[in-house]
Amino acid sequence: MSERGFSEVVMVTAVPDQLRAFYEALGWQAEDHEFSPDTLAYWDLPEVTGSECVLQAPDADCRVRLLPVPNTVPLSRPLMTELIVPCGLFDINMRTIDSERTTDFIQEHGWRPLTPPIPWQFGDNAVKEFLAVQADGIVLVIVERVSPPLPGPPMDHMSHVFNSTQLVLDHDESLACLEALGFAKFAEFTGPLPGEGPKVLDLLGRPGDEGDIRLTISQPAGVLDGAIELISTPNIPVTPILENGQGKRGLAALRIPCDDIESRYNKLASGDWSHIINKPLANRSIDGADQLCYAVVTPGGARLDFFAG
């Protein structure tokens, strides 16, 4: 079984040029690929407006795949959706060395900050954090580590996508699903976020214990890079958006490289979680070459793709 987390984010977008320009301005390298009928079926895309674009981060094994569609395609997460409403994949997370500078930069590329950078303390880490959203309803979390410094070489401006969040209704069920897919939980927090932290999800000022969250982080090797974060609000009644989000605009999937993919798939297909399989294991034309891959949709509506790599 692979000990890697996700290495690719898939976005279905009506503004591919805008998103491409954003990542290229950060030094990501773009590569275009023509769609085949096989690819269109795999991504549940009845209509596209151009070729797909795969962007490679300059300093990490991380890619963003842009699938261009007409702006008449509905959003998987409508723009006015309350932040805490479960609806498939919620966000992608990127680090920055300067959140104020980044606020201006992302607005130049079509992102709308939902708050100014919010300073707060989580354990030993002092951070600034804020959310931004763009026209397809994709949510981007910007995190600046104020202290202590992050290990490794300094960033020039912003990092690759280092993790992703899913808001869930049944936390235990979603956690068990990730465990069955090889993602082991390595961190958990329950309660109110300290200081100004609740502002990030618009939970500050909630009465009683409504501002409490449960947060878990899972990744095959127990590291943050490529991890999936689950968040639930156990004391707030929420109605999830349960409509099938496949093929709609927004954050469409996370792609996970894995070793011995056939054994992994057969174990899933013969076990208690076989019902989450969305696309069976097959060789498909991805980026112009055959790739053995399959996809699942988790109980909370998040699509996760596994590919031989």
Where are these regions (language model features)?
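Hydrophobic, helix-prone linear segments
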Residues: M1-N71
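Vicinal oxygen chelate
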Residues: M1, M11, H33-F35, S51-V54, ...
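ER-lumen resident redox/N-glycosylation machinery signature
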Residues: F35, L45, S76-T81, P198-L201, ...
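Amphipathic alpha-helical segments
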Residues: V15-A30, T102-E108, D170-K185, S270
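Post-signal peptide N-terminal segment of secreted/secretory-pathway proteins
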Residues: P74-P86, I97
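Low-complexity, glycine/alanine/valine/leucine- and proline-rich hydrophobic stretches
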Residues: N235, G247-R255
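Short consensus segments that form the blades of beta-propeller domains
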Residues: D44-L45, T81-L83, P154-M155, N244-G245
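Eukaryotic phosphotyrosine signaling hubs
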Residues: F6-S7, C87-D91, V161-F162, R249-A252
